[in-house]
């Protein structure tokens, strides 16, 4: 995000306030250096049991973070609030990611490699992600493009628009995002959807936990195919992308 992060010593204590980034740190071989995570850092499954949980992504316990005495705090522009970042950077070096596409992910990995002296592992991860992407692109060549709406919330209904990582992943999947002309996460009505000639509606399992009951209800109301999809593979960047392309294959049919 164009911020200078000044480190006066090698990093040995990391507080990470974003689930995607926590998982990525572990996959880069840095688990021993993580001292604090959020309650939403669910991967790997044991991480919240062995590290201090300092709150959520929008509200953190600053006293807990202070007791952990971190060398650096890792944040994300979308997940964490400006208030959290500004409060923390008065006391600690803070690195803030702004990830909306694959290139941003690769840049984040490159920066982590430099910050945490793990450039070799970071480079290997980048190469693996790019290889998976290349193979998936080949797989997708024969697929028909579908016009979709990707739901992230209910009451009110909200969908993914442009300038989001989800939108980028929809593009990689060969989907035409019906809300590509709108910014971020617009609110929509079911009446609006009827006029869009959609081929498919995708209901994400996060942040709102859409279930099969929602899927069946919307399908009956709109008469459009509705699929329940794993939101982690559409919205988590970093090492989660390694498994994403295999998951996407299953969505499109092997």
Where are these regions (language model features)?
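N-terminal ligand-binding lobe of clamshell/alpha-beta domains
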Residues: 1-254
């Amino acid at each position: 995000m164009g911020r200078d992060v000044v480190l006066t010593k090698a990093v040995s204590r990391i507080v990470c306030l974003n689930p995607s980034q926590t998982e990525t740190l572990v996959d880069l071989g840095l688990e021993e250096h993580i001292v604090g995570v959020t309650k939403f850092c669910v991967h790997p499954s044991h991480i919240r049991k062995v590290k201090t949980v300092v709150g959520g992504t929008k509200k953190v316990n600053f006293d807990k973070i202070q007791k952990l005495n971190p060398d650096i705090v890792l944040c994300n522009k979308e997940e964490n609030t400006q208030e959290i970042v500004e409060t923390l950077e008065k006391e600690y070096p803070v690195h803030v990611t702004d990830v909306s596409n694959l290139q941003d992910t690769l840049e984040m990995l490159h920066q982590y490699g430099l910050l945490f002296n793990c450039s070799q592992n970071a480079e290997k991860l980048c190469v693996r992600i790019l290889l998976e992407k290349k193979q998936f692109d080949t797989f997708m060549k024969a697929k028909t493009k579908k016009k979709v709406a990707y739901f992230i919330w209910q009451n009110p209904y909200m969908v993914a628009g442009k300038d989001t990582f989800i939108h980028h992943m929809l593009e990689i999947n060969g989907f035409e995002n019906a809300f590509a002309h709108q910014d971020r996460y617009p609110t929509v009505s079911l009446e609006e959807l009827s006029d869009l000639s959609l081929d498919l509606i995708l209901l994400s399992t996060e942040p709102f936990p859409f279930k099969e009951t929602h899927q069946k209800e919307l399908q009956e109301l709109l008469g459009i195919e509705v699929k329940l999809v794993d939101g982690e593979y559409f919205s988590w960047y970093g090492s989660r992308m390694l498994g994403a392309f295999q998951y996407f294959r299953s969505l499109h049919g092997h």
